[in-house]
């Protein structure tokens, strides 16, 4: 059990759940000044103003946190990340500055193809080590749940390697992690002249092996057949 008291500002509080918030309502965030928050069994047990706090009746296994001059708010949920990757593509930033389009960079072997090449040579241990550093960084910045995509493998074996890494990361961090199989992130070089065969490979081989939690197709102009992604 945890009691957080003397909270300067408790952010995003609602007496009753809301299905969604849209339009002008998004400008308003419900807050309580000088608040308390009780947590029991990892769930919020109660909250309110310190002026209305009834005090503590059961001190058993209770941890008290004084949050004077501090703000308490929900953690962030990052629903789109590529935390697992090998190396960077900073050289392509110069290409973009010089006016090259993503498609032009891709045709030269850059973009996702560049990342796939780097990932091919990286070990699972190397990928885990670098990804853990990134996860720790976003956790310190307030993220509590994160989605991680594959998609830099572009082959069944490499995509499986990425998904194994993501699975292992779940056990190495307190963050909630959801995995997404993004095998159709780009078309590998060997399938550039027969793109439909790559889509068939994803559907017939990869999906049959139930890779990841979800199959998603990314539509990029000139990189995919639109009709093949529906």
Q: What role is predicted for each listed range?
A:
Residues 13-72:
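Histidine-rich, glycine-flanked metal-binding segment
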Residues 1-4:
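Extreme N-terminal starter segment of soluble prokaryotic enzymes
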Residues 14, 83-90, 157, 224:
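Short, function-defining helix-loop hinge/capping sites that tune catalysis or transport
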């Amino acid at each position: 059990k945890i009691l957080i008291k003397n909270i300067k500002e408790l952010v995003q509080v609602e007496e009753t759940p809301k299905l969604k918030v849209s339009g002008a309502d998004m400008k308003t965030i419900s807050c309580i000044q000088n608040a308390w928050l009780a947590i029991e069994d990892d769930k919020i047990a109660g909250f309110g103003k310190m002026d209305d706090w009834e005090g503590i009746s059961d001190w058993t296994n209770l941890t008290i946190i004084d949050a004077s001059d501090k703000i308490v708010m929900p953690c962030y949920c990052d629903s789109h990340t590529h935390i697992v990757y090998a190396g960077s593509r900073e050289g392509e930033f110069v290409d973009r500055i010089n006016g090259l389009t993503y498609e032009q960079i891709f045709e030269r072997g850059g973009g996702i193809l560049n990342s796939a090449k780097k990932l091919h040579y990286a070990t699972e241990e190397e990928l885990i080590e670098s990804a853990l550093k990134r996860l720790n960084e976003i956790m310190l910045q307030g993220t509590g749940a994160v989605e991680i995509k594959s998609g830099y493998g572009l082959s069944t074996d490499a995509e499986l390697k990425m998904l194994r890494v993501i699975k292992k990361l779940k056990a190495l961090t307190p963050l909630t992690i959801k995995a997404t199989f993004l095998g159709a992130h780009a078309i590998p070089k060997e399938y550039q002249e027969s793109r439909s065969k790559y889509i068939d490979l994803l559907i017939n081989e990869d999906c049959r092996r139930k890779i990841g939690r979800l199959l998603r197709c990314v539509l990029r102009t000139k990189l995919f057949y639109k009709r093949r992604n529906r």
